[in-house]
């Protein structure tokens, strides 16, 4: 384990909601800002610290309208009874929004612009559709391929470029569900999931503590029967090898190492490096490759040094293409060990902090020291974070 410097950015804790189905799911009657506020309250209670120390609440959210509008980051702080002296902001880097929230807080800590931050993200894709209110510039097709706005087609492109077969994708999707359900049954999500009240299929109030999107009965045989959904004539990407539409929130408590010591809080990890990178919008799923290469270089590490990895599974074709480019195809046993977004869902603004929290818990369960969280971002970006247990 590493020795901390006073200005090291440390992760004290991280939590998330269970992931709910967006269509008639368990959070169908729960607002995005309400579930986020519940999560923040639970994070504060679990760590028992003086919230007057909070500099800012930084929340990732992609479609910032309706219940997710009017600076949801600030609204969450007020709903969660965080002192009004703390600020609140909402950030949008599409799929990487809540990982960007983490990066923003880390940068402020590193530059003496605050010591304690609550970060996280949310997306209620059942209440606020992914394309709600979106008006793409008609001239955009002069600058990048029109299909770049259709995430499934970008996955098809990556799959063809990298020779990813339909069977490989089906196996990847099957394994995501298998691992996620095994993790659920073994209690490996218990430390990260905070129960939020929702409703069962009959409308009865229930405490939601199990990811609703996982399909325990998934089999290779059932996946093989599905038709391609984005390119019906020639495609290989199906609904089962795409991340599910879902509702959920995630949150983390981050601060300087010195402030954690002053408050008597034990850090779980420190941030070693962070990076953003762009790529062609038509192959947006490739973004984790250059972002990870940057982050590793900044940390003075190589991909071989990574002991546990969380890669957001936007699509199986995309995930496998990234693993191929990073020479990680033969290291699947350390990647998404508890399943990924194909099984758990991908609530856009939630996912960045969610995979970082899941990574940290997996590292503790496997007793590894160095880990990587990385994800692709629509319109051609990638974001990566390297963390080290302390």
Curated annotation (Swiss-Prot):
Subcellular location field: Cytoplasm
Enzyme Commission identifier(s): 2.3.1.16
Family of the protein in this entry: Belongs to the thiolase-like superfamily. Thiolase family.
Biological or metabolic pathway of the protein: Lipid metabolism; fatty acid beta-oxidation
Job of this protein: Catalyzes the final step of fatty acid oxidation in which acetyl-CoA is released and the CoA ester of a fatty acid two carbons shorter is formed.
Keywords, ordered alphabetically: Acyltransferase, Cytoplasm, Fatty acid metabolism, Lipid degradation, Lipid metabolism, Transferase
UniProt-listed InterPro entries: FadA, Thiolase, Thiolase-like, Thiolase-like_sf_Thiolase, Thiolase_acyl_enz_int_AS, Thiolase_AS, Thiolase_C, Thiolase_CS
Entry's Gene Ontology molecular function annotations: acetyl-CoA C-acyltransferase activity
Summary of subunit composition and partner proteins: Heterotetramer of two alpha chains (FadB) and two beta chains (FadA).
NCBIfam families (alphabetical): AcCoA-C-Actrans (TIGR01930), fadA (TIGR02445), PRK08947.1 (NF006510)
Catalytic activities: an acyl-CoA + acetyl-CoA = a 3-oxoacyl-CoA + CoA
Main location: cytoplasm
Source organism per UniProt: Psychrobacter sp. (strain PRwf-1)
Active-site positions on this chain: 95 (acyl-thioester intermediate), 346 (proton acceptor), 376 (proton acceptor)
UniProt xrefs under PANTHER family: 3-KETOACYL-COA THIOLASE FADA, 3-KETOACYL-COA THIOLASE, PEROXISOMAL
GO terms under biological process: fatty acid beta-oxidation; phenylacetate catabolic process
Protein name: 3-ketoacyl-CoA thiolase
A Pfam family that the UniProt record links to this protein: Thiolase_N
Top-rank lineage group of the source organism: Bacteria
A GO term from the CC aspect: cytoplasm
């Amino acid at each position: 384990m590493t020795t901390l410097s006073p200005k090291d950015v440390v992760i004290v804790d991280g939590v998330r909601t269970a992931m709910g189905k967006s269509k008639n799911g368990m959070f169908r009657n729960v607002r995005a800002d309400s579930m986020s506020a519940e999560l923040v309250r639970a994070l504060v209670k679990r760590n028992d610290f003086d919230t007057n120390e909070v500099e800012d609440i930084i929340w990732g959210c992609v479609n910032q309208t309706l219940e997710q509008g009017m600076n949801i980051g600030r609204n969450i702080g007020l709903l969660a009874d965080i002192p009004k002296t703390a600020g609140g902001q909402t950030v949008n880097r599409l799929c990487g929004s809540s990982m960007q929230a983490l990066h923003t807080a880390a940068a402020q800590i590193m530059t003496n612009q605050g010591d304690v931050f609550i970060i996280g993200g949310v997306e209620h894709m059942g209440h606020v559709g992914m394309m709600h209110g979106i008006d793409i510039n008609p001239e955009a097709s002069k600058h990048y391929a029109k299909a770049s706005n259709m995430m499934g087609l970008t996955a098809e492109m990556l799959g063809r470029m990298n020779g990813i077969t339909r069977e490989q994708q089906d196996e990847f999707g099957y394994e995501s569900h298998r691992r996620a359900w095994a993790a659920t049954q073994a209690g490996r999500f218990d430390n990260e999931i905070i129960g939020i009240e929702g409703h069962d299929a009959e409308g009865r109030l229930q405490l939601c503590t199990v990811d609703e999107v996982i399909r325990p009965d998934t089999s290779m045989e059932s996946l093989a029967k599905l038709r391609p959904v984005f390119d019906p004539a020639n495609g290989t990407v199906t609904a089962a090898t795409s991340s599910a539409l879902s509702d959920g929130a995630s949150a983390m408590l981050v601060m300087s190492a010195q402030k954690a010591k002053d408050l008597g809080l034990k850090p779980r990890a420190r941030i070693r490096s962070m990076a953003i990178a762009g790529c062609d919008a038509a192959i947006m799923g490739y973004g984790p490759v250059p972002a990870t290469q940057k982050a590793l270089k900044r940390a003075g590490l190589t991909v071989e040094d990574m002991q546990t990895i969380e890669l957001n599974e936007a699509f199986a074709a995309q995930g496998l293409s990234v693993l191929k480019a990073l020479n990680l195809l033969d290291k699947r046993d350390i990647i998404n060990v508890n399943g990924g977004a194909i099984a758990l869902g991908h609530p856009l603004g939630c996912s960045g902090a969610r995979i970082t929290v899941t990574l940290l818990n997996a590292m503790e369960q496997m007793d590894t020291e160095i880990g990587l969280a990385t994800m692709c971002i629509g319109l051609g970006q990638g974001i990566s974070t390297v963390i080290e247990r302390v």
